[in-house]
Design a protein with these regions (language model features):
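Acidic, metal-coordinating catalytic segment for phosphate/diphosphate chemistry
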Residues: 1-37, 43
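Nudix hydrolase/Nudix homology domain
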Residues: 14, 59-61, 71, 98-100, ...
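A glycine-rich, hydrophobic loop/mini-helix early in the fold
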Residues: 33-66
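The catalytic Nudix box helix
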Residues: 48-49, 64-97
Length: 172
């Protein structure tokens, strides 16, 4: 079943058009869709990361949860859905805290970042078949090492540092 996204201009004004996802082509210039990224931290201060399915773009790379907001969905609802789909964690919308936004002109993405501080452990995680193949609970320092070694998506790590900054990454 095709995936559709609502289109926006750079100022997040709706263009009242939908776009069918196609990994082989870029978004039209000056048009954007919303992508959500969720940094999930448990009571022990560990960050949940997942490993992408080998058949997906950037396969076998580690990242935090996230994905595109579907047509008709709010960014917050998209974040709740993506977190559940990729990890099995059921967060209520009020449990996700909006942390910031990064606009990527080249890819036509407006990235919204959320923080989820939840009571979860390894037994709470259920991976999404076809999307994720592994997970780990790690420290920010471990993520930095994984980024340096090419195991963690470097652009995702750089965006995390830009948005979450001193909150979690000041000791790296």
């Amino acid at each position: 079943m095709p995936e559709y996204w609502d289109l926006y201009d750079r100022q997040l004004r709706p263009l009242n058009r939908k776009y069918e996802r196609d990994d082989k082509k870029r978004m039209p210039k000056g048009e954007f869709h919303i992508v959500v990224n969720i940094l999930s931290i448990n009571k022990d201060g560990e960050i949940l990361i997942t490993k992408r399915h080998p058949d997906k773009p950037y396969g076998n790379m580690w990242e935090i949860s996230g994905g595109s907001v579907l047509s008709g969905e709010s960014p917050l609802d998209g974040a709740v859905r993506e977190l559940f789909e990729e990890t099995g964690l059921k967060a209520a919308p009020q449990e996700l805290r909006y942390m910031g936004q990064i606009i990527r002109e080249r890819s036509g993405c407006i990235h919204n970042f959320y923080l989820y501080e939840g009571d979860f452990d390894e037994d709470s995680i259920t991976l999404q078949e076809g999307e994720t193949v592994d997970f780990s609970l790690v420290t920010p320092k471990e993520i930095a090492k994984m980024s340096d070694s090419g195991e963690f998506l470097d652009f995702a790590f750089n965006r995390m540092r830009a948005v979450f900054g001193d909150i979690f990454f000041h000791h790296i």
